[in-house]
Structure formats: C-alpha cells, structure tokens
C-alpha cells in the first residue's frame, strides 16, 4: 500500500508527523491530493484541550479545512474525475434524523465528520462526496477556496443573527472568523465596530472588513464605554458578536448591547465552562442570546 506523510492527533498537545498508509477510496469515495490546508481556532483549541465532537477516537487525522485536486475516484462516482479542483466541508448531515427533519442540519445526530487535512492526501467519504464536495471555479486559488468551510460557518451565523441594514454591530475578537463576521455584517448594510488586540488584525479590520470603527482593547479598561460612544445616544449596540471563546468575554458582551439588543456567542468555550449572567438585564431589557454551533 502506498504511503504518505501526515500529522496525526494522539492527545491534547500531542501531535506527530508520521508516515501512514494512503486510504484507498471506496466505491463512492474520492481521494484528494491536498493543495492547501488552513488552521482555524477550532484546530488550535483541539490541539490544546481536545474536542468533544471532531475527535471521536485517537490516533486521528488532524485538520479539517482544505482544498485540493482529485487523485482517484471510486467505481460509482460520476460527478468527479481525476484532475478536478475541489473543496469540501468537513461534515455532512444524514438528512433523516430528528434534527435533519427540522432542517437543523448542523445538529444532526449522525453527522459524518472528516479530519485529516494536514496530510498529502485525504479520502472524502460517500456522504460528504454527495452533499459537500464542490468543484472550485476557474481563477479561484486553492488557498482562497479552502476558506469555503469557515466562511459557510460565518454565513450561517450572520443569517441566524438577523442583522439588518442600519444596525450597529460590534465584533469582539478579530481572528479570521471575526474578520469574516465583520465583513459580512458590513455587506449586510450594518455599521460595524471591530475590537481586538493584535495590531495586524486591527489593520485587517479596516483594510479587509471595512469596519467603520476599530477598537484596540489593550488601550481601554472599560471597552463597553467606547462601544456605546459609537451608538445613538450611547444606548448600546444592536448586535454584539463574540468570536473569542472565553467565558470572561462572554460575560462582558451583555454590557455592550441596548435594550432589545442581541448577543451572539459564536466562539466556543471549553466543555463544562459556566458563566455568570445578569438576569435582570436579560429579562427586563429583553436582551436576546444567540449561540450557533457552526
């Protein structure tokens, strides 16, 4: 059997660069030669502390955002051929379970998951081939195409949030996800305030996301005052989006929004994490909480 180089996940903070067998595609599967693989916040969290959903058993393939070239297809595959440029989501719903029938596909009870992008090849299973393997348009690079999966997560988050033209939206945490959230909110017609600490990302919040205001959180002990200063009569944000995944940031988000505002908790915290919330604020000010599993 042919071999390839791959990063394998064994345990939190234990990943290994190894030579492993290339998994030959079954009749309904596709073997892809990786051309670009990204590292997202979920990969970093998984490396640091594991993951309750992505890693079912160890050792496991690692990495889940990728684009590449079809190397080989199974006997029954007709929609793809060797040489096709493709990108895939790392999951696909069953379409039959309780949640799928309610069209909550990301909550599927039998979600098919795919890890192994940090390798020379990856074998895409049947369900993902059928539902979430896509050809890359001519002119789009592998590096940009690999953003399809995280961008889809953000699109889902923006749709669930219900951002309207003219809303004032604050995004806290401007890594790749936060930057895409800010950019899409801007495209929705919102006034966008982006906040973070990294100078490079603060610059990207302006240059890439076109944020109306950018806040360097290192400079302010009470950033909620700065956010509110950019809103009508200092009432607070229409929507506040958390893209960090830390409980102390979750708790602070509720001080940023106006009465009737929305707090979107997009960044996932460690399993078992609890937070303290001001119940008076939630109840009497009718603050809405949205939390999206991508």
Model-derived features: where do they sit?
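Hydrophobic/small residue at the entry helix of a nucleotide-binding pocket
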Residues: 153, 177, 201
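Conserved beta-strand positions in the Rossmann-like core of class I SAM-dependent methyltransferases
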Residues: 71, 193, 264
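Glycine-rich adenosine-cofactor-binding loop
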Residues: 167-185
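Glycine-rich phosphate-binding loop and adjacent beta-alpha segment
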Residues: 247-294
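Glycine-rich beta-strand-centered segment in the early N-terminal region that forms part
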Residues: 23-37, 51-98, 135-139
